[in-house]
């Protein structure tokens, strides 16, 4: 989306805060329904970030597949679970939580140092200079369609056969 700088930055910060708060909600909320709704918020914010970076096809696929199907399936599965088992034994802190906190904190620290030490200016200019000339002639979804019907035709058909076999297997297992 071609927005002025301050509006783009505001939306980027707003969506980033939505991602962070939704992620915290997924991890910290004890009710699985609320946790699934927080996951839906995270997936919608990711889709809006794709729109903000001019990837409209990926944003539409994110909304349709993850928010529309996967999150609804998670909520559907959570509603069938027994909700009383989550409130019986609630330990505030265990050894596994401390170990996980240590690993996640160290990964976060390494990620922050990597981001601050990387020269992003050179990366931006090298990706812009290597753009394909076809980019201006046809849209992203047309490029995806052309590649799926020419270069990736065989893998695309192979994946569709594997998904069909998995669907038939799931129906067979569900009937038994």
From Swiss-Prot:
One of its GO terms (cellular component) is chloroplast thylakoid membrane. It holds the Pfam family Oxidored_q3. It is found in: Plastid, Chloroplast thylakoid membrane. It catalyses: a plastoquinone + NADH + (n+1) H(+)(in) = a plastoquinol + NAD(+) + n H(+)(out); a plastoquinone + NADPH + (n+1) H(+)(in) = a plastoquinol + NADP(+) + n H(+)(out). InterPro entries: NAD(P)H-Q_Oxidoreduct_6, NADH_UbQ/plastoQ_OxRdtase_su6, Nuo/plastoQ_OxRdtase_6_NuoJ. The keyword NADP applies. It comes from the Eukaryota. Keywords: Chloroplast, Membrane, NAD, NADP, Plastid, Plastoquinone, Quinone, Thylakoid, Translocase, Transmembrane, Transmembrane helix, Transport. The keyword Metal-binding does not apply. Its EC number is 7.1.1.-. The chain crosses the membrane at residues 10-30, 32-52, 61-81, 92-112, 152-172. It is a multi-pass membrane protein. It is an enzyme of class 7 (translocase). GO terms for molecular function: NADH dehydrogenase (ubiquinone) activity; quinone binding. NDH shuttles electrons from NAD(P)H:plastoquinone, via FMN and iron-sulfur (Fe-S) centers, to quinones in the photosynthetic chain and possibly in a chloroplast respiratory chain. The immediate electron acceptor for the enzyme in this species is believed to be plastoquinone. Couples the redox reaction to proton translocation, and thus conserves the redox energy in a proton gradient. Belongs to the complex I subunit 6 family. NDH is composed of at least 16 different subunits, 5 of which are encoded in the nucleus. This is NAD(P)H-quinone oxidoreductase subunit 6, chloroplastic. The gene is ndhG.
């Amino acid at each position: 989306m071609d927005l002025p700088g301050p509006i783009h930055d505001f939306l980027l910060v707003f969506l980033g805060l939505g991602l962070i708060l939704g992620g915290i909600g997924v991890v910290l909320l004890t009710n699985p329904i609320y946790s699934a709704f927080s996951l839906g918020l995270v997936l919608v914010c990711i889709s809006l970030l794709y729109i903000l970076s001019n990837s409209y096809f990926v944003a539409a696929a994110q909304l349709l597949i993850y928010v529309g199907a996967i999150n609804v399936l998670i909520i559907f599965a959570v509603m069938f679970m027994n909700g009383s088992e989550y409130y019986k034994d609630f330990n505030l802190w265990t050894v596994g939580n401390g170990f996980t906190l240590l690993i996640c904190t160290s990964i976060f620290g390494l990620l922050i140092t990597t981001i601050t030490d990387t020269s992003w200016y050179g990366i931006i200019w090298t990706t812009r200079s290597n753009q394909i000339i076809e980019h201006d002639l046809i849209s992203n979804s047309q490029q995806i369609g052309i590649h799926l019907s020419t270069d990736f035709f065989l893998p695309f058909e192979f994946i569709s056969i594997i998904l069909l076999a998995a669907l038939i297997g799931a129906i067979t297992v569900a009937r038994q």
